[in-house]
Amino acid sequence: MSDQFDAKAFLKTVTSQPGVYRMYDAGGTVIYVGKAKDLKKRLSSYFRSNLASRKTEALVAQIQQIDVTVTHTETEALLLEHNYIKLYQPRYNVLLRDDKSYPFIFLSGDTHPRLAMHRGAKHAKGEYFGPFPNGYAVRETLALLQKIFPIRQCENSVYRNRSRPCLQYQIGRCLGPCVEGLVSEEEYAQQVEYVRLFLSGKDDQVLTQLISRMETASQNLEFEEAARIRDQIQAVRRVTEKQFVSNTGDDLDVIGVAFDAGMACVHVLFIRQGKVLGSRSYFPKVPGGTELSEVVETFVGQFYLQGSQMRTLPGEILLDFNLSDKTLLADSLSELAGRKINVQTKPRGDRARYLKLARTNAATALTSKLSQQSTVHQRLTALASVLKLPEVKRMECFDISHTMGEQTVASCVVFDANGPLRAEYRRYNITGITPGDDYAAMNQVLRRRYGKAIDDSKIPDVILIDGGKGQLAQAKNVFAELDVSWDKNHPLLLGVAKGADRKAGLETLFFEPEGEGFSLPPDSPALHVIQHIRDESHDHAIGGHRKKRAKVKNTSSLETIEGVGPKRRQNVVEN
């Protein structure tokens, strides 16, 4: 602990009420956030002679200052704690790296309802089904629903302006409510009701109604209609037979955890109406010496309390470990949801099977992640050997993308010892150059990236320039002219040129623009990591360019005229 921090004097000022505390190091950085039912008692525990773990010892040794926020209740303290963790990202807290909103399937409240994927706040009138683990799961489900229940998935702007049915109607994927006379209101409403029941997990009701309609059609000698309904019944049965369904039909989130080699994986199964909608694995940042129960407890708090605006809370959460604050967490979540939320750690029956499945998936995902990291380490070691460097801890790669010189975008991607560091990927809009001048674009992005102060830990060991000798010459010129405080001679500049037929494995590498290039064998691990970071940079640049091009495509030329505001633009367009 720092000599400048007087723990005894500080503890005399601390209250015994519930609240949240923030610990700072000598640089004024928040290094830990915690909550307590009794602040005085909890903070006193940090300054005993025998501490519980090495992690706590390392934390206390760096404390320079502690700030305290008193709250009315322990529940309020729990919510505030996770808000602070999200805000400050302290290095001694377990940190959930994923904070994306989850997608839902949206059934609109229009006269002829549509199905669509939805993320974010639920403002639009209609029904929301989910959450699903990712966009792919939603799109896959929508494609399946379109085959079984042909209700529209088009945007309202398209729907309102159609005078003839589209291709989806022609291939039997939509009933065509956009054109009068193609489908009756009753038939369309019936298909919408089937979708509603199906997404709610009530497959039996869907099948019962369909079978009844098929028998009625058959009795009325409407054999084509009966055959169509029969095909629909078979499609529903094929889907429902594919997955294990709990008899309870409850909404659950099941959380399993695995830990190995200093890395944790938390796997979440999303179960709605007794069906597994999908799952997702998370790899929270875990400080050394952290107990596994703390990983689970912190993850659950951050997962639900930080993302409460975007996540629908299930009726029950099954956990792999006992929590010290299980009741507090359940009460906080219940208060947030406005209904009772159960947190269970010792399930039986189907629930135990779900927990075992989540645990197995966590272990499998962790093994895969560790294997990937091991591969990256091997490749970086091989690259360091090829480049005659002691080690490669950090690499950055640049690429340029444009269409006929327009909407030029440069990308910078970053790899560290564990592979892609996507949080540090950057795109740069390139302006003020001759259209199509890739050399000027590379010159500009390198000056913007490196012509400023850089923390020592962020100085790359290798900078890859995609484009060969000419682009490498630009990079050399930029670095020769840089006037910066950090060691600009540390990064090794490496040019990468594709082969004559631009096939992977035929790349030529250059240390100097004037020198001879060299190639690596196609099976070289060093070449593989170069190809990986170059492809990431290429994809990142193209992605940025496409977004910029789409934005320009959807922008009126009137918007570029100074002094012409939204109202005047609207008047010009209308008149």
Swiss-Prot record:
Record's GO cellular component terms: cytoplasm; excinuclease repair complex
GIY-YIG domain boundaries: 16-94
Annotated keywords: Cytoplasm, DNA damage, DNA excision, DNA repair, Excision nuclease, SOS response
Domain UVR: 204-239
Transmembrane segments: none
Cellular compartments annotated: Cytoplasm
Pfam family, one: UVR
GO terms classed as biological process: nucleotide-excision repair; SOS response
InterPro entries: GIY-YIG_endonuc (IPR000305), GIY-YIG_endonuc_sf (IPR035901), GIY-YIG_UvrC_Cho (IPR047296), UVR_dom (IPR001943), UVR_dom_sf (IPR036876), UvrABC_protein_C (IPR050066), UvrC (IPR004791), UvrC_RNase_H_dom (IPR001162)
Disulfide bonds listed in the record: none
GO molecular function: DNA binding; excinuclease ABC activity
Family affiliation: Belongs to the UvrC family.
Summary of the function given for this chain in its UniProt record: The UvrABC repair system catalyzes the recognition and processing of DNA lesions. UvrC both incises the 5' and 3' sides of the lesion. The N-terminal half is responsible for the 3' incision and the C-terminal half is responsible for the 5' incision.
Database matches in PANTHER family: UVRABC SYSTEM PROTEIN C, UVRC/OXIDOREDUCTASE
Subunit structure: Interacts with UvrB in an incision complex.
Protein name: UvrABC system protein C
Gene: uvrC
